[in-house]
UniProtKB/Swiss-Prot annotation:
Species the sequence originates in: Methanococcus aeolicus (strain ATCC BAA-1280 / DSM 17508 / OCM 812 / Nankai-3)
Entry EC no(s): 2.7.1.237
GO terms, molecular function: GTP binding; kinase activity
Protein name: GTP-dependent dephospho-CoA kinase
Family annotation (Pfam families): DUF359 (PF04019)
Entry function: Catalyzes the GTP-dependent phosphorylation of the 3'-hydroxyl group of dephosphocoenzyme A to form coenzyme A (CoA).
Pathway: Cofactor biosynthesis; coenzyme A biosynthesis
Amino acid sequence: MYMLNESTKEILKKPFGKVYKELPPINRKVNIIAVGDITTKNLLSKSIIPNLSIIDLKTKRNIPVKINHKFKTVFEVNNPQGCISDEAEETIKYISSLDMVDTALIVKDGEEDLLTMMVIRYFPKDTIVLYGQPDEGVVLLTINQDLKHKINNILSMMDKI
């Protein structure tokens, strides 16, 4: 399990990509991963069905979010706040090896925020990842080798228990 520490908390406050106030146009010909309930809900409202949605059914840690969508495949994991559990990492790694569409990974205990790093680590280059930047908008990034390298550096700085 990876755990945040003071140095990685500071690094992770900055978005990994450009922050948009509104959902930007998205290339639908590549894998699309949504991390966060509001991001997922916004994509679905525009009839964009992500290959994978990572959600915990709440926003800002405790406000419930209802997503009116029946995902084709659902996985559930525990992922404590401020951590990346081994269970969550292995599940994302497994999902990345499949050719899945309309899949949900529901974090039933904890939060999903840090799982963006596992998506970047395990999904192929050119995958589009969207995640919410609280009170700012949505971050859109495209996985590339530089981003994978940056994420691996951050993960190496986190506490491993």
